[in-house]
């Protein structure tokens, strides 16, 4: 297996666009670094899709509601592992990216990547139970790793909304350079 890190203008989208871009970045990195993560992520995504299909089918067949517990237990099994691995990844990423960003900006800026899970691993089961009726009404799963996000904070400012284009570009470059380091390790 050859691990590659590619830098392109589209990498700015990780910083600027919605949470899906940032989850995709995180998942791609973790899949390169951890084969088990890839298996867990594939399993989790399959379970979420099945659960969402069930939530849509409940309208026509309310007796299926009993089977939600089965899907929830499987979501918990995969989801808690994903949340923990993402948390560890962001911790490791911060150890690298802060030095890189500090050097790129001549020490003027401090960059921090903040992992924003939709639920903590230890609360996931309670959140699924609490959100169940809402999920049924909305016909979709409202909490779990598929709703997580990352924020990029420079000197206390969330740069997705409030940072300059220069800050966003420097953060994207810092992120890609950090990838190189993490993949090499």
Positions of predicted regions on the chain:
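Conserved NTPase motor "head" modules and their coupling/switch loops across ABC/AAA+ ATPases, GTPases
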Residues: 59-185
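Nucleotide-state sensing region of NTPase/ATPase domains
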Residues: 1-21, 25-37, 94-99, 127-133
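Long, charged N-terminal accessory/stalk domains
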Residues: 13-14, 20-66, 73
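Short charge-dense sequence patches
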Residues: 1, 21-26, 42-51, 76-80, ...
């Amino acid at each position: 297996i050859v691990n590659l890190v590619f830098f392109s203008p589209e990498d700015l989208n990780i910083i600027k666009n919605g949470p899906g871009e940032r989850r995709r970045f995180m998942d791609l990195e973790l899949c390169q670094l951890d084969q088990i993560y890839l298996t867990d992520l594939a399993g989790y995504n399959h379970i979420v899709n099945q659960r969402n299909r069930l939530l849509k089918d409940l309208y026509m067949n309310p007796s299926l509601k009993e089977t939600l517990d089965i899907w929830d237990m499987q979501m918990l099994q995969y989801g808690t592992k994903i949340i923990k691995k993402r948390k560890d990844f962001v911790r490791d990423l911060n150890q690298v990216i802060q030095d890189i960003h500090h050097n790129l900006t001549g020490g003027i800026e401090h960059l921090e990547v903040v992992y924003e899970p939709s639920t903590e691993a230890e609360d996931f089961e309670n959140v699924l139970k609490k959100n169940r009726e809402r999920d049924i009404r909305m016909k979709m799963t409202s909490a779990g790793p598929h709703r997580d996000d990352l924020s990029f904070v420079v000197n206390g400012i969330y740069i997705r909304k409030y940072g300059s284009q220069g800050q966003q570009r420097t953060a994207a470059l810092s992120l890609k350079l950090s990838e190189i380091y993490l993949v090499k390790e």
